[in-house]
Amino acid sequence: MSVVGAINPVPIAPTTRRRVGDSLDVISERPSNSSDYCNTINQPIVGSTDLDGGDATGQDSSPSSESSASSTGSHYHHDHYHRFYSHPVIRYLLLRKFWIPFYGGASTVVIGQGFRSGRNVGRRILGLLMLLVVASVFLRVYLMGGVRVVDHARLKEFVVVRTLRDDWSMAQREVAENQASSQPMRVLEKLPIPEIWQKPESGNYRQCVTRPKNYTRLQRQTNGYLVVHANGGLNQMRTGICDMVAVAKIMNATLVLPLLDHESFWTDPSTFKDIFDWRNFMNVLKHDVDIVEYLPPQYAAMKPLLKAPVSWSKASYYRSEMLPLLKRHKVLKFTLTDSRLANNGLPPSIQRLRCRANYQALLYTKEIEDLGKILVNRLRNNTEPYIALHLRYEKDMLAFTGCNHNLTTEEAEELRIMRYSVKHWKEKEIDSRERRIQGGCPMSPREAAIFLKAMGYPSSTTVYIVAGEIYGSESMDAFRAEYPNVFSHSTLATEEELEPFSQYQNRLAALDYIVALESDVFVYTYDGNMAKAVQGHRKFEGFRKSINPDRLNFVRLIDHFDEGIISWEEFSSEVKRLNRDRIGAAYGRLPAALPRLEENFYANPQPDCICNKSHPEQLRKQSSLRTDSKSWKKSALR
């Protein structure tokens, strides 16, 4: 007893269960200290080895009342509550402190006082159970509101996880969908595209360059090897290579990967493989012509026969003039490739082959294609449209045409000297003013800016300049004053991105080609080789808007506007009227009296490679032309 009392001053009766309950009462009245509870409850009860052997009451314990511990009241409680107190749960509750986590100490006091008296213990236990039920309901609602309640059910050997919140959301969504299904569907209207960005109506025209389904290429021995030296700038070489593919087909020749021009104005040392995806070129055309990387060893050491084909020649020329030479010498080299095949009057299969070569086989290298796509995405920031302006106001073009409008005297003299230094340029003395009035000069940057403004393009329009270095010290100032959002490959790409291409003008021209092809509007101020190639490609891709300004009438109008003869409103209205039908719409290319006067095949591949599917007679006409063309195929085999 003295040992126990030294540890804890709370008096503990040695014999009866009632003393145990009284001890708990005394403990519950002390300050809430977890260490005290542990020390008190965990002490051994002196004089009692069996907790089930005594009885207890709810009376307060005191030393003077120890003699009444064995009164009849004790036996009464022992008789009626023996089973209750002997239950393991109750024994645990009597020896432990109760705690409800969400109401703290207040709940502890309430429950503790519930056991202070042995009277009506059943009611208090019932109340405790009811409290637990209420608490469980509260937790259920609380968890449904924010905590995931996961139920696992085994269904066909799969574990299904259900979340109450998700089930509730699904139910609400199902109700909403059922209600919405009974109402008319609301369709979001697309904002109309402004007219200045709309492409022309393409009608029912479609690409028609595929081979017939029953096409089988005859396996026959080659008549020889054709080596071609493409001349000129990138786009002149590009179209020339496509013509040489067709010529190789006509003569049943094996085409060697073309050689590119390294001696023209640009002096670009790039090879065919540096600019074009040569594997794709060979793979796309493998069912049409045989293409090899190099001459076979037995022919590599031979000196080929050099020939320059006649410009705008028909298939009959190559069959009658060139094919015998090829068969005799086995290796034939063409030193020129530009415009060496007629625009019209060729078999439909040959015309379609030219288109397959240009639009499907001649892809640029992956490095060029990837950077081109990056530049397009930067121009289309937030899906904004942009104009690609082929401003052919470059030194070589101005020297060739003799145009020096708006240039200084020193700059005009520099152009004249350059024109005389190029031997194959036949025209030397040119009246610049007269050439401009005739519409033979490219627009100056100022004229191009005024033209775009008159056509309705706002100053906020993004403009990409498709050209090399613009000639003239102050030529671009007037353009930037009207259109400040102007870019080129040198300002749009980083130095690191341009580093592999910066020293190669043809590779930079390939980048410009991609950006121009993908533009929302393409405007070209002069009918150069790039303008022809890009506008034809855009027609082939679905008649994307390509504006060809009426330069002849524009020169007259802008001079009148500068002189104050007409107002801006009159000037703008007339510019729009004159160029209303010059936006790249569908129309068929027609032959002319002289090949030089014809529209270039690659500037407008319709109707040969773009067909009207709603007109079966056009397809029947092409079928008859294929039948008529069998004769030249037989001659090529002989």
From Swiss-Prot:
GO terms for molecular function: glycosyltransferase activity. The chain crosses the membrane at residues 125-145. Disulfide bonds: none annotated. CDD domains: O-FucT_plant. Pfam families: O-FucT. One of its GO terms (biological process) is fucose metabolic process. Keywords: Carbohydrate metabolism, Fucose metabolism, Glycoprotein, Glycosyltransferase, Membrane, Signal-anchor, Transferase, Transmembrane, Transmembrane helix. Residues 61-74 have a biased composition (Low complexity). This is O-fucosyltransferase 28. It comes from Arabidopsis thaliana.
